[in-house]
């Protein structure tokens, strides 16, 4: 492992937390790289779409005084740069998490968005997980946007990165309200301008949008695959903490309501004034401090 102090050189914020890096080999031979912070009982933080280990820098730092925090880069990004294969399923991500749990001995997991889906599925199948906290898994209880997947695949295959990003944000209902009134061609132009600035000035330790965009289709493939999985989660024996923000899209609250009814060992917290990005760094729209406080209490309970 190499010790490292990270500095985000973007003008919006400076994010510094000391960490070391390591890697594990997953069942299919894929190398999964991760960051490690702090000392204490192990926790793994699983990222969602359009994010990498850097997005959890502040959250990991706020937990590192009590826990050893492991933050893997999921397949196809950052320290785990081997691209997804065409035979992808959520089981691949579960196997990646299993390999990290086996190496580190960690028994607690936090997952955000699609990372929350991975964490739920892992809690169902991996006895090593004793506690899992999940932030707004996109189960789309009232209907999965299946039409978005072939469109995403086509746009990415054609190199239309900006169009793919807009398709993904609209399908996930993650864009600002103004997205619903701005014409598509203008949204694409604005996104291209942002990407051009990023290409010119760099993105610090954050992965650029251009690098993350190809992974979107696999996150949506996971969402489609997990449709109808709700009832299976009744068999989860691990303790589960459901987390969400009061300003998140309404469908995510519906999904949490449904999960709360089926999970046998469940608690729930809603953060007033926070949204889906709450666990990310502050320069990415997050407010990780209250999330860290909730996780610390949950994972420290006997």
Regions found by a protein language model. Name each.
Residues 70, 74-110, 285-293:
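Active-site loop/oxyanion-hole signature of alpha/beta-hydrolase fold enzymes
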Residues 249-255:
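Conserved alpha/beta-hydrolase "acid-adjacent" motif
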Residues 265-302:
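Catalytic active-site module of serine/aspartate enzymes centered on a nucleophile-bearing elbow/loop
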Residues 23-82:
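Conserved HGGG/HGGXW glycine-rich cap/lid loop of the alpha/beta-hydrolase fold
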Residues 236, 242-244:
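Short beta-strand/loop motif that positions the catalytic acidic residue
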Residues 50, 74-78, 139, 273-278:
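Alpha/beta-hydrolase active-site loop signature
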Residues 191-228:
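Hydrophobic, aromatic-rich cap/lid helix
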Residues 106-143:
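Conserved hydrolase catalytic core segment
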């Amino acid at each position: 492992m190499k010790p490292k102090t990270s500095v985000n050189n973007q003008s919006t914020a400076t994010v510094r937390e000391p960490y070391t890096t390591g890697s594990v080999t997953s069942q299919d031979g894929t190398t999964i790289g991760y960051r490690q912070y702090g000392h204490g009982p192990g926790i793994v933080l699983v990222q969602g779409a359009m994010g990498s280990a850097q997005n959890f820098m502040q959250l990991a730092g706020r937990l590192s005084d009590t826990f050893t925090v492991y933050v893997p880069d999921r397949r196809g990004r950052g320290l785990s740069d081997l691209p997804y294969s065409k035979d992808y399923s959520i089981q691949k991500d579960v196997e990646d998490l299993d390999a990290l749990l086996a190496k580190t001995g960690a028994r607690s997991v936090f997952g955000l968005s699609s990372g929350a889906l991975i964490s739920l599925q892992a809690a169902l199948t991996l006895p090593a997980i004793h506690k899992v906290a999940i932030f707004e898994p996109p189960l789309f209880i009232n209907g999965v946007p299946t039409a978005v997947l072939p469109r995403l695949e086509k746009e990415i295959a054609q190199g239309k990165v900006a169009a793919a990003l807009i398709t993904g944000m609209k399908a996930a209902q993650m864009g600002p309200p103004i997205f619903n009134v701005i014409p598509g061609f203008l949204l694409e132009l604005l996104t291209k301008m942002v990407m051009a600035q990023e290409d010119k000035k760099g993105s610090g330790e954050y992965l650029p949008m251009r690098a993350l965009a190809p992974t979107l289709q696999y996150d949506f493939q996971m969402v489609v695959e997990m449709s109808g999985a709700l009832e299976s989660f009744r068999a989860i024996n691990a303790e589960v903490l459901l987390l969400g923000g009061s300003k998140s899209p309404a469908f995510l609250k519906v999904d949490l309501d449904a999960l709360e009814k089926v999970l046998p060992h469940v608690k729930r917290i809603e953060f007033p004034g926070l949204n889906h990005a709450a666990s990310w760094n502050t320069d990415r729209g997050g407010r990780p401090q209250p999330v860290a406080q909730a996780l610390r209490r949950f994972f420290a309970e006997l």
